[in-house]
Amino acid sequence: MGINTVVLIRAGLGKWIASPFQCLLGKEDVYYPPVDLVEMFLTLADKYDMAFYFGMYDSGKYWQEGLFQKEIDLNMALIDEVWKKYGHHKSFQGWYLSQEISRRTKNMSKIYAEVGKHAKSVSGNLTTLVSPYIHGVKTDQVMAGDKALSVKEHEEEWDEILDNVKGAVDIMAFQDGQVDYNELYDYLVINKKLADKYNMKCWTNIESFDRDMPIRFLPIKWEKLLLKLDAARRAGMEKA
């Protein structure tokens, strides 16, 4: 099958943005980009018949500081501008809500809910995607001394989060690199169970880099990648 979906991980992070978005250039301290990468990616996705998902802007500060409405307002303005400028592309098939969380963090579901619903309303109900991560043994927080979530705790917290974002999120694609290989299947089974409960599609974000190494991030070896692919297959993931 090859590659049929391309996701822009973020429209920007902090000062760096992927295209000259006027709503960000006018309000945020960002650098002017030399190339319109969004137009380039969409044109190529059109050419090769791929589905393109546009990723939101991550301020790198507001939502971490609890200033959720600031993050929401920036992204709502971005959605309006992006859809008006790029919505004619046949490959523009959805939106990626790019703020990454692992648990009930500072009421983060508010961003998913409001931004997701706005994106869908502007674009004629295009698909929305999130890719959170599992709060497992390989997260920065746990390696710094926090406690990893058990499978049961993961299910309880994400049941609450998904209930809060009903109608705003269509696809859930958890990153798979923050738990050990022998634990992954159990978490994926819960992800699929929750996705089914809330009528969402369940993909998996298979990371092709290695979190076990002291350098961020070396390519993963095939044996590890195969273990993750097999766990995804057995758990019933719809796309990887």
Give the predicted meaning of each segment.
Residues 1-240:
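Glycan-processing catalytic domains of CAZymes
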